[in-house]
Amino acid sequence: MQAITLEAVKRETGKSAARRLKNQGYVPAIMYGKDMTENIPLAVEYTKLQKLLQKYGRNVLLNVVVNGTTHTALIKEIQEDTLKGKIIHVDFQRVSMYEEIEATVPLRFEGIGLIESKGGIVQHQLWELTVESLPDKIPQEIVVDLSHLEIGDTLFVKDIPVPEGVKVLDDPEEIVVSILVPKEAGEEEEEEGEGTAEG
């Protein structure tokens, strides 16, 4: 994963400073992590951050440039205004390129349409995996192909292939997806079975 450059500026703290930043088109942020003695309050341009997230997702390796100094970092947390759907704060975690870290990676499911065409219902139990790897090995997403599954099948964490150098920390026996028979069809089969037994 190639690091993407994002410029940031140091900011003042406090509510009035936060309002001023917002009016200027910035979103407050903070950086903490590897070899840092104190957290750095930052601000980044809202539109640039939004475009970056839309293009690369949240699991993007960043070169955060602050006053000419480059910090290798990941986005650790994003706070959003759920009503307005806007980002209100970002946490950057500075990392070492030579030390493994934990990250949460979303799952993208393919083949759902094929299962539904067979009459199956896809029941999701897990939408993301917790992984451990070097920062540049963290995938933006993990693709899960469901097209080979049949009604009644179950997909576990251990069944999901991940890139080389990535270790999954979730329980291998945890269920990710189950393929269910439609409820009505199941009820009809039960009723037919009962009718046969009575006859």
UniProtKB/Swiss-Prot annotation:
Annotated keywords: Ribonucleoprotein, Ribosomal protein, RNA-binding, rRNA-binding
GO molecular function: 5S rRNA binding; structural constituent of ribosome
GO cellular component, one term: cytosolic large ribosomal subunit
SUPFAM superfamilies in the record: Ribosomal protein L25-like
InterPro entries: Rbsml_bL25/Gln-tRNA_synth_N, Ribosomal_bL25/Gln-tRNA_synth, Ribosomal_bL25_b-dom, Ribosomal_bL25_C, Ribosomal_bL25_long, Ribosomal_L25_dom, Ribosomal_uL5_bac-type
Biological process, per Gene Ontology: translation
HAMAP family xref list: Ribosomal_bL25_CTC
Subunit structure: Part of the 50S ribosomal subunit; part of the 5S rRNA/L5/L18/L25 subcomplex. Contacts the 5S rRNA. Binds to the 5S rRNA independently of L5 and L18.
Job of this protein: This is one of the proteins that binds to the 5S RNA in the ribosome where it forms part of the central protuberance.
Family: Belongs to the bacterial ribosomal protein bL25 family. CTC subfamily.
Protein name (Swiss-Prot/TrEMBL): Large ribosomal subunit protein bL25
Organism ancestry: Bacteria, Bacillati, Bacillota, Clostridia, Thermoanaerobacterales
